[in-house]
UniProtKB/Swiss-Prot annotation:
Record-given protein name: Single-stranded DNA-binding protein
Pfam families attached to this UniProt entry: SSB
Listed SUPFAM superfamilies: Nucleic acid-binding proteins
Native organism: Rhodopirellula baltica (strain DSM 10527 / NCIMB 13988 / SH1)
The protein's assembly and partners: Homotetramer.
Listed Polar residues bias regions: 137-156
Length: 169
């Protein structure tokens, strides 16, 4: 049976991004986001639930996020879940985190809640490319990570049976 591991989250950074480099030279950015959800409680009152998620980005995506985002910045992240397990004081522990494969900065300049360098909401897709060929991030609204993917291709939505007016949202 096939499996599917995909997550999409939109929230705000709860702390500044920690950027480090692996011995191979690949950038790794680690941060967490808060995702707010409003729902109606059984008594009819609206309540807000907050969930916190640890996010890890790799490669150029990590560098862009570190350069333009800071605590409070809104962000959209798409990726996959990964469970880390370890042992501490003889007890097995585990934590589920998100390996971000794509991210998008939300909002414009000055709307990001303190985006670093004044470009907190500036989409990476509009950044100039220093090389001759278009960068991957310039071909879409997302900044793509250099992480290996569990699948080689994604559905494009152009195949048979795709009818845009039938989308329920």
């Amino acid at each position: 049976m096939a499996s599917f591991n995909r997550v999409m989250l939109m929230g705000n950074l709860t702390r500044d991004i920690e950027l480090r480099y692996l011995p191979s030279g690949m950038a790794v950015a680690e941060f967490s986001i808060a995702v707010n959800e409003k729902r109606k409680a059984s008594d009819g009152q609206w309540v807000e639930d907050v969930s916190f998620f640890e996010i890890t980005l790799f490669g150029r995506t990590a560098e862009v996020a570190s350069e333009y985002l800071s605590k409070g910045s809104p962000i959209f992240v798409e990726g996959r879940l990964k469970q880390d397990t370890w042992e501490k004081d003889g007890q097995k522990r585990s934590k589920v985190k998100v390996i971000g494969e794509r991210m998008q900065m939300i909002g414009g300049r000055g709307e990001s809640g303190g985006g670093g360098g004044g470009g907190g909401g500036r989409p990476a897709a509009s950044r100039p490319n220093s090389g001759g060929a278009p960068a991957e991030s310039q071909r879409s609204n997302y900044v793509n990570s250099n992480t290996p993917s569990s699948h080689d291709s994604q559905p494009t939505g152009d195949g048979p049976g795709y009818d845009e007016p039938d989308i329920p949202f």
